[in-house]
Regions:
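HIT superfamily nucleotide-processing domains
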Residues: 1-168
């Protein structure tokens, strides 16, 4: 795929769905690099709109919008997946710290696993209040090579995710 077109293709495809979460959960939308982890409860993949290597989203398969609506099996699995994903991101040097975000205002339950990178701190500061500005900046300034980096990060995270035999 041509570098210039990757950004437009991912953005256009993601924006063509009423519910991006449902599209990912049903396999109708293929996130950059494909999925990292899938089960009957959740999907772990790169964000299909924001080209930041290591920015992952856990999407529930059921169409609920709140952590409190999840079954025990789902939130236990989510905890394990967050732990493995965070370790993979850090082991690969994609971030030294991450921020987890889950908002109920979204139509579909998802959790952001957002990597903190030096350029983000320098340009925007750190913390949850900066994430929208960082995301907007990444989308507005995205190039095809940014999406290629996201796809490469997904391949590396997937390998690290399954390689790690982490004790819980």
């Amino acid at each position: 795929m041509e570098k210039e077109n990757m950004q437009q293709i991912y953005s256009d495809e993601a924006n063509s769905y009423d519910c991006i979460g449902c599209a990912i959960a049903k396999g109708e939308l293929t996130p950059p690099g494909g999925t990292i982890y899938e089960s009957r409860n959740i999907v772990l993949a790169a964000d299909p709109e924001v080209p930041i290597p290591g920015f992952l989203i856990i999407t529930g398969r059921r169409h609920v919008n709140s952590f409190s609506m999840l079954y025990k099996e789902e939130w236990m699995e989510i905890g394990e997946v967050i732990s493995k994903a965070e370790r993979a991101i850090k082991n690969l040097g994609l971030a030294q710290e991450i921020t987890l975000v889950q908002e109920e205002r979204s139509k579909h339950f998802h959790i952001w696993i957002f990597p903190t990178k030096d350029w983000m701190i320098e340009k925007f500061g750190r913390g949850v209040s900066c994430l929208r500005d960082i995301s907007r900046y990444a989308m507005e300034n995205a190039t095809g090579s940014d999406w290629e980096e996201v796809e490469e990060a997904v391949r590396e995270i997937r390998a690290e995710f399954y390689k790690g035999n982490y004790e819980y």
